[in-house]
Structures are given as C-alpha cells and as structure tokens.
C-alpha cells in the first residue's frame, strides 16, 4: 500500500517541477503528536521525530539516535535510514528541486537541513492530496481559574506588553499553541496527549490581542475572557488581519513560526527575529503550579506502585507488553482526576526495551518472560498536572554484568537528583554528572538526560533540558526529567526516570523529586553504591511508604516495606 502511495506521489513531481518532496513528522502546529501523521502514512515510521525525503529513485528517512532501531524495524524496506546527527540531509541530497509545505517548516530548520538545494514552496500538501485526511470535530476550549494557575491572563499579557515596548516592537506573533494556552490560561481537546488548543495569537504593545483559530472553538472563552468577537480570526483570514494592522516592527520566533506565516507578515512589516518570551516565562512554575504537580504525582505514584507490585507478583502468568500497559492504564484510571496518557506508553520487554521510544501494538507485542527486563515509560495528564516516569523491572535473577550497568545508570540518576545547583548551572553541566559512571565503562546513551515538562501542557517542554548541548540556566521553579539509561541492541534497555523541580531554601538551589514510585532493587549491585547513594534510596523508599501505606493492602504494604 505504501509503495503504491509513493508511486502516486512521484507522479505529481512533474506537475510541480520538483525532483523530490519533503515530509516532516510535525503538523502545522508543530505538535509532537500530530493528528494527521503524514510521515507514518508515507513511511510506516511511527516515532515522534523524523523527516522523509522522497526522490524520483530513492527514499530517505532521517531520524535521531532514539529512533534508529525503530526506524529500521518499521519503515518500508526501500527507505534508507540516516541518523540525522551524523549526516544532515544536505550532506546526501544536493542540487535538487525539493518541494515542501511552507506550513510545516520554519525558515531556520529548512535552511539548516537543505543547503545546496533549490527549495520550492507548495501550499497544497501533496501527502494530503493522496491520503485525504478527515478533519475531526473538536470540543470548545475551556478556561483555568487563577486558583489553579496562580496568575491571571491579564498579568501575563502585561508582561508581554512590556517585552514589546522594551524591544521597540509593535506586535508579537505567538505561533506555538502551548504558549497561547499558557498566556490566556486556556486548555482544549485538539491533541491526543496534551490539553493544548489549536490556536495562534497576535498581541500588540497596547495589550490588544487577536486569537487565530476556528471560531466555533471559542464560544465559551469569549465571555470568560471578555474577548470581542472581532478579535477572533479564522485561520483562513490571517492575511486580511495582517493587512489591517498598523505599525512597523513584528516579532516572530523563527524556531516555531512557519514559513507560511512569516511570508505573510513580512509583506507588510519589518520582522524582528527573537525568542518568544513566553517560553522562558512558562518554564518557571509558580507555587500554585508546583503544588498541583505534587498532588498529580502522588496520584500517579500510587498507580505506579500498585502496577509494579502487580507485575512482579503475577505468579508465572505469561502476559504481553500490551496487556501490561493496559493494566497500568487501569490503575491510573482509579483516580477520578486522571484524564489520559501524556504520551503513548512504552512497555518494552527484552530486546524491545532497547528501542528507546518503542510502542507495543497488537502486531508488535511480545510476551514478557521471566528472564526479561521490562522497561516501562509512561505518564498521565491529571486535573491538574502532567507526569512522566520510567522504571526498569526484572522478574528473575540477572547476570552480574546487567546489574552493574543498571547500577551505574542508577548512580547517574542519583547524582543528578543530589546536585547542589549554582546560579549559573546549565543542563549541559548536569548532563555530565549523569553519564560519568557509564562513561568510565565506555558506555553511553543516545538521548538527553532530561527534558523540561509543562504544567498541564506538553510532557516535553523547553527551553531548559539536561543534555550535552543545552546552555539555559537552571532556575527556581523549573521542572525537568531525570532519565539516564543504557540500551544494548537486540538484548535489553535500561532507564530510570523521575520528574524533578528546582527548589530554593534561603540561598540554596537543589532538585526535589515529584515522582514517587519504587525503584527496582533486584537489579542493584550494592557493592557499587556509596553511603550517600544508599541513604538516598533508603529515604526515597521510606517517603513512598509513608505516602502510600494507608492506601495499599497488606501484601502490597509488606512488599513496599521490604524495599526500605
């Protein structure tokens, strides 16, 4: 079927005078979890990041290090798989006329990837012409009260107004829907794993705003936010709006503003390319948001604790990866505040655990055997909070070599958790701490140690992260994941992940755990742990027991007490 679709796509090349066509993973909102997954439809690759290039004779799929194994397993056989950090598209594809949809690319990433090629903008997406995606009806947006988010939308808008004035700008184009959600304190139902409403926004220095979205989505919030109906702009009318606006300087963020919108704006205004200030404002959570996240993680941790006990005590009953992830979902649903997963659960047994972002399906699901190591990475959206946690679980005695690797991953995890932060610490500096024990054994992992996390928004959020290249200063109120790992192709995967936040007492900054879920002790070589690390584990499991013992049955309590 896919090969037939590729043939149909190639038949369109002559009409548009192109040698190839570029298909990214993201949709026009640059969502990580795109509803219309064009990349999967043309390549069968289901990972959350990647770019396909279909040429007249060759097909290429560029992915990052998390997805190399998965891409080889999933993609149709005539795709050449390239790791994008090793070779950019322009290193392989040169002097070609390449077609692209300007709504799906920013000028920055297009130029970086496709130097030495002639890029041809095609407004009518060629994949959409072939697959005919159906538009799904969505529910109206809804508002969050100040008691939930801790700050009114008026206060946030004032901060943006001040930013515009200080940068001698008339307007800011907020192209990222999650930033619109944060600014207006609204949420929606447009995305499968995040309460982000599909909307964009233009705001001027006088605090006037124009919300760009489907008009039927905003009937509720028009009254609640006292927005004039004339300030609601249908997506197709963006050009008319820009022509009516007066002024000179327009700020866009070319990391998130598509070429399509950039081209419309620059016809009339001088473009000022600056980072959207909302990213940094949104990254620092206030006490209301932190407290709601703590409560969400308490509920999530109880589900995880029950799940881990259950799966370690199923008495030789053979289950599949899909069965396990469905069972975890049932435990989460016991909380009335649980809404849905914050991303597709990863439950990888044995060799599947080595696929960093593996997803078990009815076709790929594997039986979990007693000798397997099971990697479970999952998360939830709650009223109100976002969770993400990974545990590596075993069911029988493992080789000493595997225990040693697991313990070195754990030592890196603890090293991050116990970091005493200075004011100029960055994710790059902290990443070194996480990897150092593995690197002593010439081992490493091909992903960052941690990503930022949103408050009842995206589970992956910037600009902060713990990675080799991130130079953003870590500040009070930031939320990050702490997830070092190791993956042996065709054998096993190990990852230990907690969500952490930056806390301040007097002049000291340090990380505090959100996540409360038992860490697998049967994989630890205690001879490799020092007193500080052992004490960390003792206190961590004691905290879990104190929090959940009253909610567990006798057998669960006994098991949990044995971990202390």
Short names for language-model regions:
Residues 1-564:
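Active-site neighborhoods and metal-handling regions in enzymes and metal-associated proteins
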């Amino acid at each position: 079927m896919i090969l037939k679709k590729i043939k149909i796509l190639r038949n369109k090349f002559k009409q548009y005078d192109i040698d190839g066509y570029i298909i990214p993973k993201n949709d026009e909102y640059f969502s990580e979890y795109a509803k219309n997954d064009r990349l999967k439809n043309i390549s069968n690759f289901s990972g959350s990041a990647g770019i396909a290039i279909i040429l007249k004779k060759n097909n290429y799929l560029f992915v990052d290090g998390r997805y190399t194994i998965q891409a080889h397993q999933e993609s149709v056989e005539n795709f050449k798989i390239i790791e994008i950090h090793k070779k950019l598209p322009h290193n392989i594809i040169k002097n070609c006329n390449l077609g692209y949809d300007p709504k799906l690319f920013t000028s920055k990433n297009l130029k970086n990837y496709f130097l030495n090629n002639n890029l041809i903008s095609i407004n009518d997406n060629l994949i959409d012409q072939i697959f005919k995606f159906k538009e799904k009806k969505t529910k109206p947006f809804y508002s969050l009260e100040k008691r939930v988010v801790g700050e009114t939308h008026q206060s946030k808008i004032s901060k943006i107004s001040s930013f515009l004035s200080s940068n001698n700008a008339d307007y800011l184009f907020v192209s990222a829907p999650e930033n619109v959600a944060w600014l207006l304190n609204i949420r929606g139902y447009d995305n499968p794993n995040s309460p982000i409403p599909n909307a964009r926004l233009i705001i001027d220095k006088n605090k006037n705003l124009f919300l760009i979205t489907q008009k039927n989505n905003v009937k509720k919030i028009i009254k609640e936010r006292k927005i004039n109906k004339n300030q609601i702009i249908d997506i197709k009318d963006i050009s008319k709006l820009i022509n009516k606006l007066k002024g000179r300087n327009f700020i866009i963020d070319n990391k998130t503003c598509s070429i399509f919108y950039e081209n419309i704006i620059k016809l009339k205004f001088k473009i000022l390319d600056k980072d959207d200030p909302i990213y940094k404002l949104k990254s620092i959570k206030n006490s209301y948001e932190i407290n709601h996240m703590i409560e969400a993680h308490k509920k999530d941790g109880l589900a995880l604790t029950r799940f881990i006990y259950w799966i370690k005590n199923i008495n030789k009953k053979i289950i599949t990866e899909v069965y396990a992830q469905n069972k975890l979902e049932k435990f989460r649903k016991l909380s009335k505040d649980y809404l849905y997963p914050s991303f597709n659960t990863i439950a990888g047994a044995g060799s599947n655990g080595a696929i960093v972002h593996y997803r078990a399906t009815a076709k790929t699901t594997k039986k979990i055997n007693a000798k397997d190591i099971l990697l479970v990475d999952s998360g939830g959206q709650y009223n109100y909070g976002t969770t993400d946690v990974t545990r590596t679980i075993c069911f029988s005695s493992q080789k000493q070599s595997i225990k040693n690797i697991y313990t070195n991953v754990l030592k890196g995890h603890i090293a991050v958790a116990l970091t005493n932060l200075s004011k100029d610490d960055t994710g790059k500096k902290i990443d070194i701490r996480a990897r150092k024990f593995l690197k002593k054994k010439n081992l490493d992992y091909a992903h960052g140690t941690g990503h930022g996390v949103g408050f009842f928004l995206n589970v992956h959020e910037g600009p902060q992260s713990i990675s080799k290249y991130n130079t953003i200063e870590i500040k009070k109120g930031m939320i990050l994941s702490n997830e070092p790992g190791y993956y042996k192709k065709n054998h096993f995967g190990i990852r230990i992940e907690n969500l952490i936040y930056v806390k301040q007492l007097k002049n000291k900054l340090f990380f505090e755990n959100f996540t409360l879920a038992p860490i697998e002790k049967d994989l630890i070589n205690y001879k490799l742990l020092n007193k500080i690390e052992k004490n960390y584990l003792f206190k961590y499991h004691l905290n879990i027991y104190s929090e959940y013992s009253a909610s567990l049955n006798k057998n669960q309590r006994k098991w949990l007490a044995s971990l202390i």
